[in-house]
């Protein structure tokens, strides 16, 4: 019934298995991949024909984690998986980026890649395995995919590169780098690092590329026995038509790309396009020598060619800069004085408003991952409204691109944040992109660094980011610093590097062509370092280190520690005690399992009141000390007084006053505030209190006062 094929190799000290022919047989390609005991299923389906008029390649990658893979049941009312989590979105992008450039130019059939995590051993992260499975499924599917690719995770532990470190090893690693590519070239890099130098980062990329070669060989081996017949797809030869369009638009496009201002340049390009359309699609003529979608493809190709020719031939870029110059930078902080921290970062025609907000433990984000639930105390959200590029568009929940750019900036900033013990705040940074002409994610990195320093967050060092580009024709190449949107779109590489003056904290690379050598990457990293240091210098003109004090409107947090066996006393039955403390004092309180108590309020008096209350609950009252209390009950034999938090003690009728008392209520009433001295404990451990030895006006011990008077008289 099943015609199965299976290939198994040893990779990074664990068995990797790729198998096809048994599951999802109606898909164009389906591969079940296992690494250790983590298992994923990758499927590929591509439409037989493109939709009429389609002028782009509609590829969708969906990575989905099923909670049953880790032996869990989803939370929530419906008890089933819902919309994609942030991690699922990020892994979907991670797989999409290296496979997209490898589809044959001109292929426009609707294509969907679905990767499902079926089993998680809680040791091997499924993201790399999913990339391998997707590549294998595409390779055997028959669609025009010029792979295979593979990916690998590289760690850096004790000065050594580690291939695919398991989940428990990652906290020890100074690097979390994912690299993907073909047997010849690197196509994609995504990483977070602890201020590592350029040569270590480049070494990690090359180590990863070398390490995944056995996986590519395994996929080829599987394809040799299991691949479907390649689809009969021949890319259109548009060279003759392209030459005709070039003759009409070359001069206009060359002039348009001399205009440095973005909107004016776009208007000139649109005018050139409209002129060419009139030439090739005259009004009233039904039969034309090319289709509208062919013209659109050709025009885009010609835009790229002219920009690339100009850069390689003259060394001058669209906006007149040379290859390594960064656009003018203006940095401002404190632009929104009522927020906790704010910054406006402008670089050329790219601009971001970043606002930092400080919160308490209650504000931490609860993340329910396959590996378990954990709290995240640093959030960075990136918003890209359509007005930032002068357009109208959809507003609403963040798209994949916004989530991806936010995470890239998060990775850049995260290594420089203070430890929770030093700064016990939850931090949220929000980047609003108000203008965009390339590299808005790196503007977010710079703006976030400024806003955090403005908020008084003691980051280790300021962080800046820069986006690099590449134009390569044959042996000639040019590396571009601080690329524009057009240079990103029309170039061969998008290479984002963020870090401090001492090293890299985040690196993201997407390459659209084969043949990016180690030499080119080395040039790009060195050029990026110069640009990064320049940007840090410009940022320092606004603020160079974190403010010594938090902003006026930021909450204050004080930390105290209590014995773990007293936690239940502070919380109370059903949370009764802690709710009362919060309601009466106005402070926010968060208690950790280890007895760490964080008390937050913008009012110092509220913090002190809460601290005093909690201290009264967890501390033991001392014999001989005087305490303020409240009468909670009266009886014939005396009064019960609540003192020192939840403790009650008895003031015997003989201890109510110096004179003889006939009736308790002659001296005290329920609810009355009184001063009491702790005299000791009776044989049953009950608290014995006295009022008569304490001056009820001053709270001072009467005996002590008399002794003092006697001493003064002498």
From Swiss-Prot:
GO annotation, biological process: mRNA catabolic process; RNA processing
Residues bound to Mg(2+): 488, 494
Catalytically driven reaction(s): RNA(n+1) + phosphate = RNA(n) + a ribonucleoside 5'-diphosphate
Location within or outside the cell: Cytoplasm
Essential cofactor(s): Mg(2+)
Residue ranges of domain KH in the record: 555-614
Residue span(s) of domain S1 motif: 624-692
GO molecular function, one term: 3'-5'-RNA exonuclease activity
UniProt KW keywords: Cytoplasm, Magnesium, Metal-binding, Nucleotidyltransferase, RNA-binding, Transferase
Gene3D superfamilies with a match to the protein in the record: GHMP Kinase, N-terminal domain (3.30.230.70), K Homology domain, type 1 (3.30.1370.10), Nucleic acid-binding proteins (2.40.50.140)
EC top class, as a word: transferase
CDD domains: KH-I_PNPase (cd02393), RNase_PH_PNPase_1 (cd11363), RNase_PH_PNPase_2 (cd11364), S1_PNPase (cd04472)
GO cellular component terms, semicolon-separated: cytosol
HAMAP family: PNPase (MF_01595)
Function per UniProt: Involved in mRNA degradation. Catalyzes the phosphorolysis of single-stranded polyribonucleotides processively in the 3'- to 5'-direction.
The name this protein goes by in its record: Polyribonucleotide nucleotidyltransferase
Organism name: Brucella ovis (strain ATCC 25840 / 63/290 / NCTC 10512)
